[in-house]
């Protein structure tokens, strides 16, 4: 019996030792996780080969293009077949895709048909030069995970394809950072700002304007010449002179509407506006000169009226030609 208290005492000591050795962990004694070190983004080599550009539509501000694009990288989760984004494309589709994952790297090749949107520079139309831009991004990974590098081997476009009415002056590929001032609803982001690596291709095209210029402005110049001929109608034919001049005025206005219908809307003052405005001004000046001649005839000063018509005709024609040449020259030099 005397051993029982000793046994109970020993058991209590063992139980207490076990209880304190397995004490529950509280937030006070939990070790904090180590801070994440700065990530080094993976590099994706990208290249492009444009095979055609067609269906350039100035009114709808778009054009169509076919091209091959390829990506070479290590991380399979980048998945450019599903994550490729072309921000300035209205629509695009892949007519061919292939991928290779040998040697621990991923190679993706795609043939894409796209309808691209663009803002045309029409200030110097039809002596204009256009800069067509295409950009490519990964829709899932920002610049902290992925940066593009240019695969500069070979050319960026097929020199054999011809673009009707245009000449390709140059091409350039570049890598930039595109900022988005939004968190896209992700509360975990520290700010409403994200940066994505962007691969961009720029083609500079110059319009072959000779034939197009005369096609669009020949009616305007003929209308001016019809009004100009009024100076050589005898002073007695004022009805004919006024009729021809007013008819020419409306012909120029009609030609302006026809030309504008093929161009996108613009708030800037263009070469088309300048040439039509100049022609309208000179036709109005011809009508005003005709009115002065009529007044001189009614005053009985017919010879003076004839002399006034002759001098005014030469001055108007010279100024009109000089200003036209100047405006056209400026348009060809300002691209």
What are these regions (language model features)?
Residues 7-16:
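Bacterial N-terminal signal peptides
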Residues 17-77, 261-264, 268-335:
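Intrinsically disordered, low-complexity peripheral segments of secretory-pathway and membrane proteins
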Residues 21-204:
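Soluble non-transmembrane domains of integral membrane proteins
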Residues 119-120, 166, 217, 232, ...:
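Generic detector of bulky aromatic hydrophobic side chains
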